[in-house]
């Protein structure tokens, strides 16, 4: 008599014949190809897009300004995500296994957190920079100098690196969750379980600077509207050369603030789902399905690839710089002093 029972499902492991190996839950071949293409494209764009930003700002002397140095340093953080975080997370997300060892798992997690906070710090300082530039454009050059920008860059790197290293290399992040962490700590896994205290600290560390940036940019656009009305009034009268100069400077700073404001909004939208999900998981017993978690993670990662696209859309100088770099003209001795702006202010 034939049996109607189906054959037992073969359990796939990350490491066959290894005791304590994690269970592998692979996608179908078609899905894997699509996911590798999508995630790989994000990583490539993050690496090469941000590399273009760094080369443009550091090579062309016309772009050597306090704001642009902050943008170049922000691009460096996003470049770090693209080259040291996204490729390995891509394999982990698609294969559902970590094949790079326990030590590199810790290093990878540190880089992930450090680059995220570095981006947040850079954007916070850029918001302050834009606030001063728009509210007081003529005094701004004496307030936000290259030296001040250098200090901001130093803080934006040192604090996140020290914080992430101290948290993940000392093991304080899973205090009170040792049993759960041990249960998830199978061979081929890189699952970091963070306790409620550190998740709350992380969430507040994201929320407070975000609220400050929202307030600053809200004030920036209120001031910008007032300045626009003044410029209209000046335009309807006989304007002096001094008033004309002030109007052009104010217009330039508002345009820069708008572009960088879009960058800040993109960061908030990208990272907010992950921040909320982490908070909910910590206080609700890690209830988020794996696929929801992966979507939140990759929305955050993709932010590192978005900034160069934003600059390309709103900064004519960046598009011109890319053409010079890609055409090989950048290797000419005179390229560093090339004019990238269509109009001078």
UniProtKB/Swiss-Prot annotation:
<keyword id="KW-0812">Transmembrane</keyword>
<keyword id="KW-0297">G-protein coupled receptor</keyword>
<feature type="disulfide bond">
    <location>
        <begin position="22"/>
        <end position="186"/>
    </location>
</feature>
<feature type="topological domain" description="Cytoplasmic">
    <location>
        <begin position="224"/>
        <end position="259"/>
    </location>
</feature>
<keyword id="KW-0807">Transducer</keyword>
<feature type="transmembrane region" description="Helical; Name=4">
    <location>
        <begin position="148"/>
        <end position="168"/>
    </location>
</feature>
<feature type="topological domain" description="Extracellular">
    <location>
        <begin position="90"/>
        <end position="107"/>
    </location>
</feature>
<dbReference type="GO" id="GO:0007189">
    <property type="term" value="P:adenylate cyclase-activating G protein-coupled receptor signaling pathway"/>
</dbReference>
<feature type="disulfide bond">
    <location>
        <begin position="105"/>
        <end position="190"/>
    </location>
</feature>
<feature type="transmembrane region" description="Helical; Name=6">
    <location>
        <begin position="260"/>
        <end position="276"/>
    </location>
</feature>
<comment type="function">
    <text>Olfactory receptor specific for trace amines, such as beta-phenylethylamine (beta-PEA). Trace amine compounds are enriched in animal body fluids and act on trace amine-associated receptors (TAARs) to elicit both intraspecific and interspecific innate behaviors. Beta-PEA-binding causes a conformation change that triggers signaling via G(s)-class of G alpha proteins (GNAL or GNAS).</text>
</comment>
<feature type="transmembrane region" description="Helical; Name=3">
    <location>
        <begin position="108"/>
        <end position="128"/>
    </location>
</feature>
<feature type="topological domain" description="Cytoplasmic">
    <location>
        <begin position="54"/>
        <end position="68"/>
    </location>
</feature>
<keyword id="KW-1003">Cell membrane</keyword>
<feature type="topological domain" description="Extracellular">
    <location>
        <begin position="1"/>
        <end position="32"/>
    </location>
</feature>
<dbReference type="InterPro" id="IPR000276">
    <property type="entry name" value="GPCR_Rhodpsn"/>
</dbReference>
<dbReference type="InterPro" id="IPR009132">
    <property type="entry name" value="TAAR_fam"/>
</dbReference>
<feature type="region of interest" description="Extracellular Loop 2 (ECL2)">
    <location>
        <begin position="174"/>
        <end position="187"/>
    </location>
</feature>
<feature type="topological domain" description="Cytoplasmic">
    <location>
        <begin position="129"/>
        <end position="147"/>
    </location>
</feature>
<feature type="topological domain" description="Cytoplasmic">
    <location>
        <begin position="303"/>
        <end position="345"/>
    </location>
</feature>
<keyword id="KW-0325">Glycoprotein</keyword>
<feature type="transmembrane region" description="Helical; Name=7">
    <location>
        <begin position="283"/>
        <end position="302"/>
    </location>
</feature>
<feature type="transmembrane region" description="Helical; Name=1">
    <location>
        <begin position="33"/>
        <end position="53"/>
    </location>
</feature>
<dbReference type="Pfam" id="PF00001">
    <property type="entry name" value="7tm_1"/>
</dbReference>
<keyword id="KW-0472">Membrane</keyword>
<feature type="glycosylation site" description="N-linked (GlcNAc...) asparagine">
    <location>
        <position position="17"/>
    </location>
</feature>
<dbReference type="InterPro" id="IPR050569">
    <property type="entry name" value="TAAR"/>
</dbReference>
<feature type="transmembrane region" description="Helical; Name=2">
    <location>
        <begin position="69"/>
        <end position="89"/>
    </location>
</feature>
<comment type="similarity">
    <text>Belongs to the G-protein coupled receptor 1 family.</text>
</comment>
<keyword id="KW-1133">Transmembrane helix</keyword>
<feature type="topological domain" description="Extracellular">
    <location>
        <begin position="277"/>
        <end position="282"/>
    </location>
</feature>
<feature type="topological domain" description="Extracellular">
    <location>
        <begin position="169"/>
        <end position="202"/>
    </location>
</feature>
<dbReference type="InterPro" id="IPR017452">
    <property type="entry name" value="GPCR_Rhodpsn_7TM"/>
</dbReference>
<keyword id="KW-0675">Receptor</keyword>
<protein>
    <recommendedName>
        <fullName>Trace amine-associated receptor 6</fullName>
    </recommendedName>
</protein>
<dbReference type="GO" id="GO:0005886">
    <property type="term" value="C:plasma membrane"/>
</dbReference>
<dbReference type="GO" id="GO:0001594">
    <property type="term" value="F:trace-amine receptor activity"/>
</dbReference>
<feature type="transmembrane region" description="Helical; Name=5">
    <location>
        <begin position="203"/>
        <end position="223"/>
    </location>
</feature>
<keyword id="KW-1015">Disulfide bond</keyword>
């Amino acid at each position: 008599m034939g049996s109607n029972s189906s054959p037992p499902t073969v359990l796939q492991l990350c490491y066959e014949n290894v005791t304590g190996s994690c269970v592998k839950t692979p996608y179908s071949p078609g899905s894997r190809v699509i996911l590798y293409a999508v995630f790989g494209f994000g990583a490539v764009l993050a690496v090469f897009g941000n590399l273009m930003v760094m080369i443009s700002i550091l090579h062309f002397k016309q772009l050597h300004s306090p704001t642009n140095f902050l943008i170049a340093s922000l691009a460096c953080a996003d470049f770090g995500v693209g080259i040291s975080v996204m490729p390995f997370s891509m394999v982990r997300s698609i294969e559902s296994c970590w094949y790079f060892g326990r030590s590199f798992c810790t290093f990878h997690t540190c880089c992930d957190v450090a680059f995220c906070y570095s981006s947040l710090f850079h954007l916070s300082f850029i918001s302050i920079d834009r606030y001063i530039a728009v509210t007081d454009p003529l005094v701004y050059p004496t307030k936000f100098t290259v030296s001040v920008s250098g200090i901001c860059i130093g803080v934006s790197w040192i604090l996140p690196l020290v914080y992430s290293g101290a948290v993940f290399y000392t093991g304080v992040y899973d205090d009170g969750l040792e049993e759960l962490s041990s249960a998830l700590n199978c061979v081929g896994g890189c699952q970091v379980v963070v306790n409620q205290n550190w998740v709350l600290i992380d969430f507040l560390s994201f929320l407070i600077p975000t609220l400050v940036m929202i307030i600053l940019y809200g004030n920036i656009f209120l001031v910008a509207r007032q300045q626009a009305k003044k410029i209209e009034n000046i335009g309807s009268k006989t304007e002096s050369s001094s008033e004309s100069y002030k109007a052009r400077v104010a217009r330039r700073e508002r345009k820069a603030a708008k572009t960088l404001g879009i960058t800040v909004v993109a960061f908030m939208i990208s990272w907010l789902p992950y921040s909320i999900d982490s908070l909910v998981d910590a206080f609700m017993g890690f209830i988020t399905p794996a696929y929801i978690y992966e979507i939140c993670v990759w929305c955050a990662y993709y932010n590192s690839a978005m900034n160069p696209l934003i600059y390309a859309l709103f900064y004519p100088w960046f598009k011109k710089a890319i053409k010079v770099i890609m055409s090989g003209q950048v290797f000419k001795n005179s390229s560093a002093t090339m004019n990238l702006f269509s109009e001078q202010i």
